[in-house]
Curated annotation (Swiss-Prot):
Family (UniProt): Belongs to the glycosyl hydrolase 35 family.
Keyword Signal: yes
Catalytic activity: Hydrolysis of terminal non-reducing beta-D-galactose residues in beta-D-galactosides
Keyword Signal set for record: yes
Designated name of the protein: Beta-galactosidase 10
Any one GO MF annotation of this record: beta-galactosidase activity
Gene3D superfamilies attached to this UniProt entry: Galactose-binding domain-like, Glycosidases
Carbohydrate attachment residues: 31, 358, 396, 469, 525, 583
Gene Ontology terms: cellular component: apoplast; plastid
Length: 741
């Protein structure tokens, strides 16, 4: 059975590629306009079912099949944000290589015969580091992000214009024959506008007119922007948008973000939004006259390297989306939504051009009926009751409507789809472990860093500095080091008792080393980032070293003035001396940015000569601040691959110099007694991210996606930097096997 299904998945993959090759067609130049019902592309009104796939969250080798899987799932458009900090790493220096090859990505969408929706932002939120804005911009004097000030407006406009010109040059906008039919400026500014005062309003207006002045020939939108000027379309984001009305009556109803799942944090539980509820929300939207709908995300993918926002957003951005992180359709969600899309599209013309009537069929029961002059008719029958199934009479026929469901009758008679009746197949997902292998036997090379300053200190100060202002996010790591002299007369030395170290930090995480020994870790969590550490310390007479490794785990990506949120230590003291508490906050602190191996780029193939590695077949366990390097063969087969890091502590990993990202198999824990996990999830009733959580007591993220295209046929260099200690002998490459059941 399993073998058969694996083979059938392989042949489906071949088919997907063939369909892709043959479905190439160029889209004709088409002007895009709109009225109160829908977009008009060329001369045709169209319903748009769009799939968000963020290009830097996968690799170019995956793009064609991701786009094709979205198309097979019944989507006719792909949506992505544009990721400013990936494209402009330093002012005026642009990058469009590798995962950031946006032109290549859009051309793949075009070749698949799909439309493209481009959300330029360039502020994007998106659980992406710093909301997509380059960190350097925060340090341009006078800049306040998303507000009415010259530096922000200058850099934001320059970038937007650069992108628009690039895409115009490549003829990617619909009037040029390209796939882009819609664009977005800013992102959900309406939530924050009031915090920015009168200037906020001015900025919103300015960004809309700046966008419109770009003359791209396709409409611009702003999501969740209630006072959006009439030159742009205000759109809706959320779990449900059936009640949404746009900013002016001549605008179509656009749902820019329907969240079919949710994101995850290190230490957080697994969100789950049932397919029935996602389908319900989509059917309600189209039933109520919505005409552009986008799944955020349809493929969430991976926050490779240090791209995740936060703090604490996991490296995986799976999002429980219809296509999973590894690029495989998630069943039954993908299949159920595919069936839904088919049912909706049967009535496309009526939905956008027919006459709409809404009436009640009884308590919590509604009919949305579309008719035209020729007598054709389509109906969406909804049961809004979140507990009781209902029988309804519609046009002399009785229909059974499960609680919280919508039935679609494309001829006002035949129920072709009900959102709560899932007929799609399900799947079983396994991560099949495979030991690391090498043709000449596994040889580990090990390099351990010493806690504290390596080389010379970067600077010395009699205070605790802000972490982010110091590193400017060039690294996660910042060493705060000092030393104290303990007199032989201290009573605790004689009594054998231990003084207590007390540290306060704005976040995000901290490893403590006393006299070059690892003492412990303290960390904030997803909702409360500042933290305190209180731990007994064994001090000796004479000099004692205190080396504190403060870490960021993804910078804040949303909220008013989010770019000013700091991180790092704010107070350090030790209690239990003869004279009481020793306050070290204003002691002499020596600082060092980054860890040594990072500075020497030990993760880059060929850079190994920079330090002296120790070769061993058995690498040490539980050793902090250690680099591991091992040459491996690619895993067998062709399934997608995840690095199993369950045996490790926290750190970063690379394959052949490509950044896999941060790993941290941190256990999903309860922060309050209400933080439960569910055994069964009831799809009925309004969904919230904490409604159907699972994974209590398990690592939030155990496997880390390593794209197949990163492997060479042999001699692959896997490099790991482990901060606190773990057991590298147990690291495995697991193959993701999905069997249809
Ligand atoms: C929205 C935002 C998206 C993303 C989403 C949650 O409010 O626009 O960028 O952050 O929330 O995944």
């Amino acid at each position: 059975m399993n073998r058969v299904t694996t083979e059938s998945i392989a042949s489906t993959a071949i088919l997907v590629v063939m369909v892709f090759l043959f479905s190439w067609r160029s889209i004709e130049a088409a002007n895009v306009s709109y009225d109160h019902r829908s977009l008009t592309i060329g001369n045709r009104r169209q319903l748009i079912i769009s799939a968000a796939i963020h290009y830097p969250r996968s690799v170019p080798a995956m793009w064609p099949s991701l786009v094709q899987t979205a198309k097979e799932g019944g989507c006719n458009a792909i949506e992505s944000y544009v990721f400013w900090n990936g494209h402009e790493p330093s002012p005026g220096k642009y990058y469009f290589g590798g995962r950031y090859n946006i032109v290549k990505f859009i051309k793949i969408v075009q070749q698949a015969g799909m439309h493209m929706i481009l959300r330029i932002g360039p502020f994007v939120a998106a659980e992406w580091n710093y909301g997509g804005v380059p960190v350097w911009l925060h340090y341009v004097p006078g800049t306040v992000f998303r507000a009415d000030n010259e530096p922000w407006k200058h850099y934001m406009e320059s970038f937007t214009t650069y992108i628009v010109n690039l895409l115009k040059q490549e003829k990617l906008f619909a009037p040029q024959g390209g796939p882009i039919i819609l664009s977005q400026v800013e992102n959900e500014y309406g939530y924050y506008e009031k915090d920015y005062g009168e200037g906020g309003k001015r900025y919103a207006q300015w960004s809309a007119s700046m966008a419109v002045s770009q003359n791209i020939g396709v409409p611009w939108m702003m999501c969740q922007q209630w006072d959006a000027p009439p030159t742009v379309i205000s759109t809706c984001n959320g779990f449900y948008c059936d009640q949404f009305t746009p900013n002016t009556p001549d605008k179509p109803k656009i749902w820019t973000e329907n969240w079919p799942g949710w994101f995850k944090t290190f230490g957080g539980r697994d969100p789950h939004r049932p397919a029935e509820d996602v389908a319900y929300s989509v059917a309600r939207f189209f039933g109520k006259g919505g005409s552009v709908h986008n799944y955020y995300m349809y493929h969430g993918g991976t926050n490779f390297g240090r791209t995740s926002g936060g703090p604490f957003i996991t490296t995986s951005y799976d999002y429980e989306a219809p296509i999973d992180e590894y690029g495989l359709p998630r069943l039954p969600k993908w299949g159920h939504l595919k069936d839904l899309h088919k049912a909706i599209m049967l009535s496309e013309n009526l939905l956008i051009s027919g006459e709409h009537q809404n009436f009640t069929l009884g308590h919590s029961l509604e009919a949305d009926v579309y008719t035209d002059s020729s007598g054709t008719c389509a109906a969406f029958l909804s049961n809004l009751d979140d507990k009781n199934d209902k029988a309804v009479m519609f046009r002399n026929t009785s229909y059974h409507l499960p609680a919280w469901s919508v039935s679609i009758l494309p001829d006002c008679k035949t129920e072709v789809f009900n959102t709560a009746k899932v007929t799609s197949k399900s799947s079983k997902v396994e991560m099949l472990p495979e030991d690391l292998k090498s043709s000449s036997g596994l040889k580990w090379e090990v390099f351990s860093e010493k806690p504290g300053i390596w080389g010379a200190a970067d600077f010395v100060k009699n205070e605790l500095v802000d972490h982010i202002n110091t590193t400017k996010d060039t690294t996660d790591y910042l060493w705060y080091t000092t030393s104290i002299t303990v007199s032989e007369n201290e009573a605790f030395l004689k009594k054998g008792s231990s003084p207590v170290l007390f540290i306060e930090s704005k976040g995000h995480t901290l490893h403590v080393f006393i006299n070059k020994e690892y003492l412990g870790t303290a960390t904030g969590n997803g909702t409360h980032v500042p933290f305190k550490l209180k731990k007994p310390v064994a001090l000796k007479a004479g000099e004692n070293n205190i080396d504190l490794l403060s870490m960021t785990v993804g910078l804040a990506n949303a909220g008013s003035f989010y770019e000013w949120v700091g991180a790092g230590l704010t107070s350090v003291s030790i209690k239990g001396f003869n004279k009481g508490t020793l306050n070290l906050t204003n002691s002499k602190w020596s600082y060092k940015l980054g860890v040594e191996g990072e500075h020497l780029e030990l993760f880059k193939p060929g850079n190994s000569g920079a330090v002296k590695w120790t070769v061993t077949t058995k690498p040490p366990k539980k050793q902090p601040l250690t680099w591991y390097k091992v040459v491996i063969e690619p895993p067998s087969g062709s399934e997608p691959v995840g690095l199993d890091m369950i045996s490790m502590g926290k750190g970063m990993a690379w394959l052949n110099g490509e950044e896999i990202g941060r790993y941290w198999p941190r256990i999903a824990r309860k922060n309050s007694p209400n933080d439960e996990c569910v055994k069964e999830c009831d799809y009925r009733g309004k969904f919230m991210p904490d409604k159907c959580l699972t994974g209590c007591g398990e690592p939030s993220q155990r496997w880390y996606h390593v794209p197949r295209s990163w492997f060479k046929s042999s001699g692959n260099e896997l490099v790991i930097f482990e901060e606190k200690g773990g057991n590298p002998m147990k690291i495995k490459l697991s193959k993701r096997k999905v069997s249809v059941v």
